[in-house]
Amino acid sequence: MTTDNLNSADTTVQTLRNVLTSETEPLARRFRALFSLKHLACLQPPTEKTLPAIQAIAAGFSSASALLKHELAYCLGQTRNTDALPFLLDVVQDTQEDSMCRHEAAEALGALGYESSLEVLKALRDNENEVDVVRETCDIAVDRILWEQSEARKAEKLKPSDFTSIDPAPPMPLTAKEPSIPDLEKTLLDTNLPLFERYRAMFGLRDLASPPDLPTAKQAVQSLAKGMKDPSALFRHEIAFVFGQLCHPASVPSLTETLSDLNEVGMVRHEAAEALGSLGDVEGVEDTLKKFLNDPEKVVRDSIIVALDMAEFEKNGEIEYALIPDSGNPAAVPAA
């Protein structure tokens, strides 16, 4: 690569980093910069932009926005790169940090799948004084890493997924008899089972709901919606995240009910808001989101801002929610 190209790479990442870390930039613009950096950080094989992009994402942890910081952690967990580990380990162990951010850092460590994270994750999982959402996430992350490294994993056959995300748990393994939606729903809703196993059912149902015109899609979405009544806030928030991935209109009533419930925890309501943002082309969704622009919870208010920006992006038919540094404007980039 020529010096000019290297300088261009440096300039691209630095421009995005400046937008991401600026507290005076609109939040929606900072999110678009983040997703551009995520694209660069997740490129396989890594390029000369990979490490600077990871460092740029991590620089955002100084932000006051819990919403932004939790999204930073998620993006680092998708990189498949050991360079993300120290930043995530710092966040998950910082008891002064917002629990939503710490949860996302734990989930990201599980997604990266490195055994070197197990000691920290197990200690947090087993700490009775730790907040539930962090303990539960560490429990799932430990199980995911152990599964990733196990001999049993090598023997499992997994159904190919439409989604490129590294999930907190894989879908249920394929067997001679493919699990039915009622079977998966039963596992999903069984609070006596380990969370990791229930998450596997969740992602199995997700994959039966995509694409939206799949014959099983609506029934799978309806099964997932029953999980929004689960006693675990972590579990409820993950269902909302899955709905955001699916963009299935059948999820709108459940998401709207969740966002509208002022007694629901902010972590769940914010995820419902962002999921609705991905359904912005569905009639009535934008009007619903606008009702919560002045919500008492900051994480919900921030999510509404981002969700409305995403809804506009959906209506405009753009390819990827991101920012192109050359123009400084929102534009399309290839999906990571």
Swiss-Prot record:
Pathway given in the UniProt record: Protein modification; eIF5A hypusination
Gene Ontology terms: cellular component: cytoplasm; nucleus
Cofactor: binding comment: Binds 2 Fe(2+) ions per subunit.
Chief location: cytoplasm
Gene Ontology MF terms: deoxyhypusine monooxygenase activity; metal ion binding
Family annotation (HAMAP family): Deoxyhypusine_hydroxylase (MF_03101)
UniProt record similarity statement: Belongs to the deoxyhypusine hydroxylase family.
Role of this protein: Catalyzes the hydroxylation of the N(6)-(4-aminobutyl)-L-lysine intermediate to form hypusine, an essential post-translational modification only found in mature eIF-5A factor.
Protein name as catalogued: Deoxyhypusine hydroxylase
Natural source organism: Emericella nidulans (strain FGSC A4 / ATCC 38163 / CBS 112.46 / NRRL 194 / M139)
Gene from which the chain derives: lia1
